[in-house]
Amino acid sequence: MNGLKQAIIICMLLFLTGCVQTEVYDSSHISEAEVVEALQNYNIDLTEGTFVEEEIFVSKLNGVKPGEYELNEKLIVIYEFDTSEEREKGEKEFATKTASMNLVSYETFIKRNIMIFYVHEEHLNSNKIIPFVKEIQEALDSFIEG
């Protein structure tokens, strides 16, 4: 009888621990070089450059200076923060800096510690598909969570 009680208790404990929800935090760091390589795998060829005319997009955010690239004559910048939390602070800083500005059209892409601005300057009211947006997102989605 003692063995049966122990078996029931063990089964109950296993059942209860299986029902407990746990949050998974992805702590793996993505480097700028890994992002550039992933983009190249999706046929996005970047050229390094320095861009003054779109200064707000290449400014330091939360102490991080981004990598500046050209994609089909448009600016794309890649911020590599140390952590996702640092990236969130950078996002908030950008929102604060640009709150009262009238910016050109751009897309923001986020993945873990990475933030990308693609300054495509397309009219957002048109039905035109913005080039490279899908490919950039797919390249970032190729980084497996966990």
Give residue spans per PLM region.
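Sec-dependent signal peptide recognition
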Residues: 2-10
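C-terminal motif of bacterial Sec signal peptides marking the signal peptidase cleavage site
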Residues: 15-18
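Bacterial signal peptide processing site
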Residues: 20-23
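A short acidic-to-branched-hydrophobic micro-motif
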Residues: 68-88
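Short, Gly/Ser/Thr-enriched beta-strand-loop segments that form substrate-interacting elements
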Residues: 84-101
